[in-house]
Amino acid sequence: LSLMLAQLNLTVGAIEDNCDKVLAAAAEADRQGADLLVCSELALTGYPPEDLLLRADLMIRVEAALTRIAAWQGACAILVGHPWREGEALYNAASLYEQGQLVARYFKQDLPNYGVFDEKRYFTAATETCVVPFRGHQLGLLICEDLWQPGPALAAKAAGAELLLTINASPYDQEKPWIRRELMAERCDQTGLPLIYLNQVCGQDELIFDGCSKVFNSQGE
């Protein structure tokens, strides 16, 4: 299984431009023979979108962008983060598209509400685990804070995941690279699964997103 991790420079609110970057990355992944392009948490809106999530037109623009992604006919599948509304609930979501079809849609379970994060103001926390059969492998999908708590990763393992795939919008601070590394190694040790971690690279106001995407084997190395 070949994955391309897209550490894209995304802009909050620039949904159409962000979608262009996702599709350009998908075309490059296709040229290189990748099976799956992995994009970051809330890639279509940029992170953190904050009160833009309260605008009535936001989901119209997000749905238009997702329609463009679904229409892409390359051999490479696309995993992309975006907000998604069901009824009155707004979710922090990740969707997997393959050759015009929605294969899976996962909703974030653990919402951070400390420091620079205020996701509980906007999003509903989900409870469902998502393990996706994809080209002979079972992918356990996670979004950022889901990895910081043991429950979602262990639930994915119990549901048959063979690989943990987590998309993130994790801002930099001086200690964060080492904290992340220890955390990911711990999850691998707890689950016995390999882990892929994808983070964006950009600046949003006072926040810096430093990428540092990583691939760990099942021993946490």
Give residue ranges: language-model regions.
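Enzyme catalytic cores with a strong preference for nitrogen-chemistry domains
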Residues: 1-221
